[in-house]
């Protein structure tokens, strides 16, 4: 018969052997995972290791801020690819999704911690707004079109050359004035 105290000592020893002298793995090599120390100190990270992404009780969670032109262009290109490759659908290419997620999270790491969740919200709203605008333009040119149905490439070429679409990644885009947001 083993006592509970002895059992927990054995578990403690196992964790200690796995993680050196830090039984709960204080290693910086924990990737994007939150260590016990992170949790206790409030340094919570998303799955990519980015702090400041928690939306719970965060006043910045639905705030539009200025974001880099490079990231706006990446979001625009992602929407464009979704229309050319997948007829306005998101597609199923995990490598593309992962590459975009990595790019966004690397960008967030360059920002102040308190701006990161707002930047994520802003880029998400830019993606939604651009997608809506393109979908409405497609529906004007191809009556009866719905997401997933084929779109002639010449129609998409015309839409993505239109200044009302391209201006979404320049000028005031990424600011409150530049986004057509419906919350």
Where in the sequence are the language-model features?
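Type III/flagellar secretion export determinants
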Residues: 1-183
């Amino acid at each position: 018969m083993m006592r509970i105290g002895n059992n927990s000592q054995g578990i403690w020893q196992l964790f200690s052997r796995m993680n050196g002298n830090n039984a709960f793995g204080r290693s910086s090599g924990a990737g994007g995972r939150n260590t016990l120390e992170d949790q206790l100190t409030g340094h919570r990270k998303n799955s990519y290791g980015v702090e400041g992404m928690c939306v719970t009780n965060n006043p910045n969670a639905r705030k539009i801020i200025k974001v880099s032109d490079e990231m706006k262009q990446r979001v625009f290109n992602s929407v464009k690819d979704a229309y050319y490759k997948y007829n306005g659908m998101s597609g199923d290419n995990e490598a593309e999704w992962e590459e975009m997620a990595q790019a966004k999270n690397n960008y967030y790491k360059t920002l102040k911690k308190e701006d990161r969740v707002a930047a994520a919200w802003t880029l998400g709203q830019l993606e939604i707004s651009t997608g809506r605008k393109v979908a409405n333009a497609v529906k004007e040119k191809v009556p009866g079109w719905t997401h997933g149905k084929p779109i002639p490439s010449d129609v998409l070429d015309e839409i993505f050359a239109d200044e009302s679409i391209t201006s979404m990644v320049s000028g005031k885009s990424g600011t409150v004035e530049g986004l057509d947001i419906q919350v």
